[in-house]
Amino acid sequence: MKKTLYTLFALLLTASLISWQWEKTQHPTIDKGEVIECLNMETQQAYQLEASQAKFANLHIAPAVVNPADLLGTIVPFNAADGKPGQAYFIPAKKKSDKWLIVIQEWWGLNDNIKMEADQYFKDLGDVNVMAVDMYDGKVAATPDSAMKLMRGADMNRMVALIQGAVKHAGSKASIYSVGWCFGGMWSLQTAIIAGPQAKGSVMYYGRPESNMEK
C-alpha cells in the first residue's frame, strides 16, 4: 500500500514540475485587444501595423552572432524597378544555373545571420544561385525598438521595386524560388506573386499570408 502511495505521490510531483516548467517557458501572449484585424486590409500594409505592438516585438529572438569571415557570398548591386539601385547578398551557383533562390530577411534587416542562412541554403541545395535581397537599403537593426522603427518606416513601393528588380536580375528564363522569416515570410509569398509564371516555389516561415485571393 505504501509503495502505491509513494508511486502516486511521485507521479503527481512529476506532473506538477512539468506543468510549472511549461508555464515558465511560454512566450508572452498577445491580448485580444492587441490583435490587429486586417482581413480587409492590404497584406503588404498590415504587417507594418503589427510592428507597433510591443508584445509582437518581444516574440522575436535576437539574431545569432556570426563571424563575417566565414560567409561565402558578397554584396552585389542590381537595378530596382523604380530606377534606383538595390543591393543583395549573392552566392552564385558553382556552374551556370537558371535556378534562383531569393532569400528575404527578418525584420532586423540583411544582417550576418540572414547571410549565414543564405550560405546554408547554398550548401544544401547545390546547383542554385542564392540572392538575399536587402529590403532596407543597407539599414540593419540591433534592438527590437530599432527593428520596429525600420519595419514601420519601410516604403512599400520601394520594397516591391526591389523584388521586381531582383526577379528581373535573375533573368526571364530563371526559375524563381523564395524563402523568408516573419516579415520575410510575408515577402516570400509576395515574391512568388510578383514573379508570376517564373515562380516555382515559396516557403513562408511564420509569415502573413495574402488575404487578396485574386492575387
Residue ranges and their predicted role:
Residues 1-4:
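Positively charged n-region of N-terminal signal peptides that target proteins for export
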Residues 175-177, 200-203:
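Residue in the alpha/beta-hydrolase core beta-strand immediately N-terminal to the catalytic nucleophile
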Residues 27-55, 61-69, 74-171:
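Serine-hydrolase catalytic machinery in alpha/beta-hydrolase-like enzymes
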Residues 14-26:
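Bacterial Sec-dependent signal peptides at the C-terminal "C-region" and cleavage site
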Residues 180-184, 188:
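Gly/Ala-rich beta-loop-alpha elbow adjacent to hydrolase catalytic centers
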Residues 111-115, 186, 213:
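Short N-terminal helix/helix-N-cap motif within the alpha/beta-hydrolase-1
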Residues 190-200:
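Conserved hydrolase catalytic core segment
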Residues 201-215:
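The feature captures the conserved acid-bearing segment of alpha/beta-hydrolase catalytic domains
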